[in-house]
């Protein structure tokens, strides 16, 4: 069962990290948005392998707070909760268990 969570991940050339992050959050999140800045590596191609991931390319405005706020204002969020992750982060099993409880 997926949680009522939308995950927003900001990326720029994160091909070394993004797969692990997505493999971790895609099974539990209803929707995952990757806001790409735009990458010149295989970040976007890796993201396209996941069915509940939508990549939105947006030029990096200069800091992550602005990029995240842009995402909140411009992507369709239909869940009760939003979780922001970096591409090199993942959820520990204990946190996932807590989210389900």
Give the role of each language-model region.
Residues 4-6, 31:
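Cell-envelope/extracellular polymer assembly enzymes that use nucleotide-activated donors
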Residues 9-28:
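Short, well-formed alpha-helical segments that are part of the catalytic scaffolds
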Residues 19, 41-49, 94:
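Acidic helix N-cap motif at the loop->helix transition within catalytic regions
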Residues 24, 36-45, 60, 86:
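A conserved acidic beta->alpha catalytic loop
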Residues 42, 87-100:
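Acidic donor-binding/catalytic loop of UDP-sugar-dependent glycosyltransferases
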Residues 45-74:
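Conserved donor nucleotide-binding strand/loop of the catalytic core
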Residues 71, 79-90:
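Short beta-strand-to-loop acidic/aromatic patch adjacent to the donor-nucleotide binding site
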